[in-house]
Amino acid sequence: MKVEPQSSVENFGAAGADTDYSVEAVDLSFTYQDGTRAALRAVGFKQARGEMIGIMGASGAGKSTLAKCLNRIIPEFEGGRFSGSVSIGGRRLDGLRVCDVAAEVGMVFQDFEAQLFSTNVAHEVAFAMEQIGMDRAAMNQRMTPALEAVGLRGFEHRDPTSLSGGEKQRLAIASVLALSPRVIVLDEPTTDLDPEGKAEVFALISHLRERGLSLIVIEHETEELRRADRVILMREGAVISIGPPAEVMINLELLEQSGVHPPSLNRALEMLGIGGHAESVDDAYAAIVRAYPRLESSAQSIAREPDAVPAQTTGASALATVENVSFNYTAGPQVLDSISLAIMPGDFLAIVGQNGSGKTTLAKHIVGLLKPVTGRVLLDGRDRSALRAAETAREAAYVFQNPDHQIFAATVWYEVAFGPRNFKLAPDEVERRCVEVLDAVGLLSERESDPFLLSKGERQRLAVASVLALRPRLLILDEPTTGLDYREQRRMMALVTELNRSGIAIVVITHTPWLVAEYAQRVALIRKGRKLFDGRVREFFADEGLLKTASFRPPEVTRLARRFGTLALSPRELADWVKERV
């Protein structure tokens, strides 16, 4: 039976059936207006009241499309061929408008900052309530509990733009909570957050779960979803696995093939011939000790073995030198505070730190996008302020966190050719360089394609290709794996590693601990505009006090290794260490 559109969400639940399910999705299929391939293919699931479901899958698997079907954004706002049905609390959504469903299914989008636009926190939380016609007294009754629930009480008069990344995400969640929805959908809620911000958001998710809310969390990473009641694994618009995390997350090859990062603890257990699912470091430790009783936890201090020093650094002078640089934006607080840093030939340096610590600001000084208030930057021993833009571009290149801020040409080939042509290179040299770098990043077959029709991972690689065509000696990448699925992350880092081996110095700004552990040779930790640490990766991860001060959580496998009194940066390292001792 078709339900006629309602004029108010007040009436939403009136005709709802008595049901134990918050969400029932039946045979959902959808193809976007201009799409040639189905984004969803006969997807169905039921969510019990108070259940937390995680949805995993590669970019383009259909996760966000499925989420938009749950609150009528599809097919109401985003048109295409839609079939199937969704019921919320036993009431089918057929014919309802997005505004009718908003108070029942709250959604926090992947780009949570796009949801924030008011002048202060209180107005932000009030906005959605105003739109459904709630009176002021009711709004005031809901405002404080919503802010308390997310830890933002007392922030009512703060400008949202002044909040940290984690605080902004919590504000977006508070705006949804104020509507008292049955279901909250969070689409990759921690994508742009530092480890501390991620911990804040998932602590909040745990709190909401304890309150009995039904939660659907979309994630690339498996670590936090292990605590879900069930997980759904999607590939190419279809559900390929559904069940408790302990069942789904032991199929490591299927996860990897589906663009999902397999849990590192499960990988270590597999490499040791133990297998199974570890929900925590404690679980993994217990499983290893049961399998290998001779292994005992050691209280000894962790040996700080030096990493191998690349041959290129021996006796070399710095490619880039930052000398006592301080900087603040107009009328703003100090972002860099007398910071110094040297980048050597052959370096593979990871710059880490909390959101707002000054990492990107530092990188922009190196490539000349910003000028220091005090101090100076040298490129190959020359003061960068005296260099022309073209001279800087030949020495140091910068790839933005969002490749769409860098891409503008009509075709992939013209995007890559733009720099060499500006340098007045001969046409045959331009062609040679374009072919060379597009082949290196795996995009040669896309040379005539529209860049904006490429996937996020492909656009990221195109941005790298466009600066590589100038043959810089130093390449700086700002969060190069943000928004990419696991396969894309590995492909991007394999490319970056190969560039480093070819002689290009690499600087990666990142929040991802396993990426630092497995790829970088050196780490610089920035906190409040100052450099707290600059040294080898093993030394960094061995310093528990430093990591705690910086709110930087090491990979789980590193935490597990510490229980045995050793240091391991990957599942393979830990497995090898155990096998040597049993």
PLM segments and residue spans:
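Catalytic Walker B motif of ABC-type/P-loop ATPase nucleotide-binding domains
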Residues: 184-187, 475-478
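Helix-to-loop junction immediately C-terminal to a conserved catalytic motif
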Residues: 71, 367
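Conserved ABC ATPase signature
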Residues: 159-163, 167, 450-454, 458
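Conserved ABC transporter NBD signature motif
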Residues: 79-91, 375-383, 392
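Conserved beta-strand-loop-alpha-helix hinge in the C-terminal portion
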Residues: 238-265, 530-557
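Conserved ABC ATPase "signature" region
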Residues: 137-155, 428-446
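The feature captures the beta-strand-to-loop junction immediately N-terminal to the Walker
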Residues: 56-58, 352-354
